[in-house]
Amino acid sequence: MVAGELQQIAIKRRAEVEEFQRKHRAGLLTLLFTDIVDSAKLKQTFGDREAVIAIQHHHAMIREILGQFSEGEEIETAGDSFFIVFTKPSDAVKFSLLVQARLRALSAEVGRPVFDRIGIHVGEVWIEEHESAGKAQDLYGLQVDTCARVQSLGQADQILLSRFPFDSARQALKGEELPGIEALSWLNHGPYRMKGVEEPL
């Protein structure tokens, strides 16, 4: 490869980096993933139509509760899962508690178990924004993958947090009464090492 070709590659690479930086910005956010546990079993038990109706009600409920948080934003919905971001870890926990309390009440009312598992993590990510609205269009980076892995470890009706949002939210919510939440308990599972992540969470 001659020097001229190398120079052209370098120029192209620099232009790609500049274009990426023009469309993206780095930011520290509280990341939240949630999905319905055993959604396939739900479809097998009640049939596709009833399961789809339940999932639609679930999605409407998620968006209704999210509307109570001015600093929360839906990034993506896929199937029965949501990717949401918040400015504060405490808001992510409040949102999660309200969602699960509503799901418990709904499941008891209709006799159809629909439970979420939720993962929360804080990290610096690359934010792609809508040019007109100034809202996040998509998020990229290792921290997004890490949050998804935290969520994947959860069980039905469980909220899992990595260390920083756990400590931050627990302190911020200390002594605060949450509507519809009788008792709030925090359980420290200790550090957990995930595949592909250097430091334990």
Where are these regions (language model features)?
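Short coil-to-helix leader/linker segments, especially the first N-terminal amphipathic alpha-helix
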Residues: 2-16
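Short acidic/polar alpha-helix capping motifs at helix-coil junctions
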Residues: 3-4, 28, 153
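Short low-complexity stretches enriched in small and charged residues
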Residues: 9-10, 38-41, 73-77, 114-118, ...
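Catalytic beta-strand-to-alpha-helix segment of the class III nucleotidyl cyclase homology domain
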Residues: 63, 67, 83-200
